[in-house]
């Protein structure tokens, strides 16, 4: 009689544990199906348009890769200044799944416990997050200035035949200050 009382709780625990693993596996495979079409290396160039209408030529590349529990977006921009100077900037952000479907948090630094966490916009660092909506992977970056004003950058990367359509916008306190649209070819 005692063995039956022990076996039943163990059986129930194993059943709940197995169902939980199946649900987690389903969640991960759903995620993989969402990011997989975006995975790859892309290159292109465009003229960035400032709010005053001036244009600056820029080369761009982006690499999107799948991670164990999220994905990485790494991008490089090379700006050609009118005086002959060349400015290159590189960025790389890991994105982790969240409890919200299709919304991803940025893991840009580690806290004292070794966990990856977003940066703190109240310290002048960008708050970054991403989302997948249909055929578009969007990365947002929010900056809060010393006076409380803000800057929001939005990178929309939409799947297109042979690559990605890139649409970038920068808003300062609600006013669009810079934008670019171009095609990035898959390598």
What does each of the following model-derived ranges do?
Residues 13-26:
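Bacterial N-terminal signal peptides
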């Amino acid at each position: 009689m005692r063995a039956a009382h022990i076996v039943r709780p163990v059986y129930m625990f194993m059943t709940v544990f197995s169902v939980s693993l199946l649900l987690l596996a389903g969640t991960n495979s759903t995620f993989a199906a969402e990011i997989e079409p975006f995975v790859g290396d892309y290159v292109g160039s465009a003229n960035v348009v400032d709010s005053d209408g001036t244009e600056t030529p820029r080369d761009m590349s982006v690499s999107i890769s799948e991670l164990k529990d999220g994905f990485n977006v790494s991008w490089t921009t090379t700006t050609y200044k009118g005086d002959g100077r060349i400015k290159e900037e590189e960025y790389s952000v890991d994105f982790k799944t969240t409890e919200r479907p299709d919304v991803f948090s940025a893991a840009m630094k580690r806290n004292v416990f070794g966990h990856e966490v977003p940066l703190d916009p109240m310290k002048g660092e960008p708050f970054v997050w991403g989302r997948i909506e249909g055929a578009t992977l969007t990365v947002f970056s929010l900056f809060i200035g010393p006076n409380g004003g803000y800057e929001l950058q939005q990178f929309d990367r939409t799947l297109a035949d042979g690559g990605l359509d890139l649409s970038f916008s920068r808003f300062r306190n609600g006013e669009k200050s810079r934008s670019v649209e171009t095609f990035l070819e898959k390598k």
